[in-house]
A protein has these predicted regions:
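Residue-level marker of regulatory loop/turn positions in helix-turn-helix DNA-binding domains and
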Residues: 1, 37, 89, 119, ...
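Catalytic-site neighborhood detector that most strongly recognizes the C-terminal catalytic loop/helix
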Residues: 151, 155-176
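C-terminal secondary-structure termini that scaffold catalytic or DNA-interacting sites
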Residues: 177-185
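C-terminal catalytic core of Y-nucleophile DNA break-rejoin enzymes
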Residues: 38-58, 73-99
Length: 185
């Protein structure tokens, strides 16, 4: 949810399985969506991709639930680790995510010293890092307005911070094409 849907940690904690819904598009195709009330109490609908729906089905089935949620399903998006239906709080989810990254870093280090830099990078990761990565990857291949709407940004300038590859391409192109001509190769 943090990466595939680009949700904020608060949005993961504050929403339920019943916030997933489907509707038929103008082309007749059924599409799943996730209704989110985000920052500033702004409502948005996030496309629930086929990949997200498949992972949701696997997650629910592994937890003894029917594969797809129903309208009004009160269960939290992230099921509590120790039974019950009470949603996990932000700090608990944050700590859970940090633990996953720490464990991943430990496993990377066990592969040998060649993996130390990657392990150190992963160890610093957080829930927001996953959202930021989602925004960056979406902005590489999608219209910036769609990325803005998916992430729930009020201003496209906020979404622009995720554009790295365009800046890299612009830098490379400028370096190649805009020269004084004084330097010799």
């Amino acid at each position: 949810l943090l990466y595939i849907a680009g949700l904020r940690i608060s949005e993961v904690c504050d929403h339920t399985m019943g916030d997933f819904y489907w509707r038929r598009g103008a082309d007749g195709k059924e599409r799943w969506w996730l209704a989110v009330r985000g920052k500033g109490e702004k409502d948005r609908s996030i496309p629930a991709t086929d990949e997200l729906v498949l992972e949701l089905m696997r997650y629910r089935s592994a937890n003894g639930l029917p594969p797809l949620p129903r309208e009004g399903d009160p269960l939290p998006l992230l099921l509590p680790l120790i039974g019950g239906a009470k949603p996990m709080g932000r700090s608990a989810v944050h700590e859970l995510i940090k633990n996953v990254f720490r464990e991943t870093a430990t496993r990377l280090r066990a592969l040998g010293p060649d993996h130390e830099a990657t392990a150190a990078h992963v160890e610093k990761a957080s829930a927001h890092w996953m959202r930021h990565t989602a925004g960056t990857h979406q902005s590489d291949n999608m219209d910036l307005k769609a990325v803005r709407d998916n992430l729930g940004h009020a201003n496209i300038a906020t979404t622009s911070i995720y554009i790295h590859t365009e800046d890299d391409k612009r830098h490379d192109q400028t370096s190649k094409e805009h020269k004084l001509g004084w330097m010799h190769p």
